[in-house]
Amino acid sequence: MSVLRILALLAATAAALPAQAKPVLHGAATENGIRWQSCLNSGFQRWFDEPPPPGLRCGYLEVPLAYATPPAHAAQAGEQTVRLALTLLPATGPKKGSVVMISGGPGLPGINPYLGNDGHVARLRKSYDIIGYDPRGVGQSTPKISCQVAEGDETPSPDDNDVAGAENQTRTLIAACIKQTGADVLQHIGTDEAVNDLNAIRHALGEPGLTAVAYSYGTKVAALYAERFPKKTRALVLDGVVDLAEDDFTQRLNQERGFQQSFLRFAAYCGKTDSCQLGGGANQALQRYHALLRKLHEQPFVTAAGYEISADDVLTVTRSLLLWPERWHELATVLRQLDAGIAGQQVSDLIDESYSPDADDALNVITCADVANPTADPQLLRRQRQEINIAAMYAHYLPLHEYPLEMCDLWPYRGKDRPHTPVASAALPPLLFVAQRYDPTTPYRNAQVMAAAFKSPLITRERDGHTLVLNGIDSCVDESVVDYLLAPKKPRHDKTCR
């Protein structure tokens, strides 16, 4: 399973918006290029799995496909454009501004951001609209990233250690991306453009300075925005922090080390409960987990409903549920049931929850638009792939002798990322960083070095987990976050929440 797939599990995933927004008229209202309408209108029905709250507004913003230098706020006549999908949850009282929610991934939709239903969120919503948006290429924004391989072009799944077969399958997928999405779009779909999109959204909202909350990969967008537009920044919260100084290899290596640490902490949790068969120490936990994966690799489990569960399915669910300790009991149940051969609907539902072909396509394409280097030494890349895979021993259940090149290794267009230690402009106000001590996928150290670079305070939560701000998980964290968003100029210091 490609490590890129793991990154799709990053960050704040979408859920239903709170329903306590004030009702608004169903007619349209235009705001600097965004034509807001009620999300109950028929044109937006496909945006939501469930009916949206009556007060939620939906709209689009046209931005350039390729930004000029310096970037313009809006598309010019005759040039190719991207249409960003946005939502607005109105403030419950007199409005003072807007808070833009920046989703993770890359490639996760953001029009339906999850907010806790508690006093801290209510205090923020009293005076601030909440803005969600799908990044370019994602969700309801167009053109949409698609890498669907046409019928008849599929290649057979390669056997274990079939490097040539795996790389041929990846080349087929890349060809489908180019055919379905377009070469011109693929070369303007990365984080560099996402930063300019964020500034265009700020301008369209009529905000002199951006106020935003960013999760996981979204913190990369936010940090680069702070560097590029310091005078147009009001307040930025970065939760689950990406280190701008890390190249792709270093980031992925550290992520795998983080997942390995979280697996061992999950195994320790298992040792304290009778409901998990991984108890008994780290080595025993690894042996039992590997034994289960090897069994499923040789013979996938088939539920009574005919649902097939493979070893890769279990790895995907494991990585997903390791992100949030509140769900470790579900992971324990999955592993226990599969080990006993009695897995049912709960297990298949969790697997379905962890898969999203659209998110996978967006993740891969946006990542490659950032990091691909067509002239890199293939042998160096293979050695790096090996080091990345070995770093997470819990997932290393099969002996691999060679490591195929992955999608970004074979991507034909050079990525625009330039890893660097950020330098905070004197014009930039303080940001606010949030991190959890045992975050599996954006290691705690990231937040430390980024907060230092931006000369900004860091809130440390001494727990496991990945992203939590405004989700109703920790009152200590959310109180400080809302205080900052309401009064960002007030002096603040580092804080620890336990």
Features from the language model and the residues they span:
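Bacterial N-terminal signal peptides that target proteins for export
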Residues: 1-7
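Bacterial N-terminal signal peptides
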Residues: 7-15
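Sec/Tat signal peptide C-region and signal peptidase I cleavage site
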Residues: 17-21
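Gly/Pro-rich cap/lid or specificity-loop segments adjacent to the active site
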Residues: 22-313, 365, 371-498
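Second-shell loop/turn segments in exported
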Residues: 184-185, 252-253, 317-321, 354-355
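Flexible "cap/lid" loop of the alpha/beta hydrolase fold
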Residues: 242-260, 334-335, 343-356
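Structural motif
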Residues: 301-316, 323-327, 354-361
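Long, low-complexity segments enriched in small/aliphatic residues
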Residues: 335, 339-340, 344-384
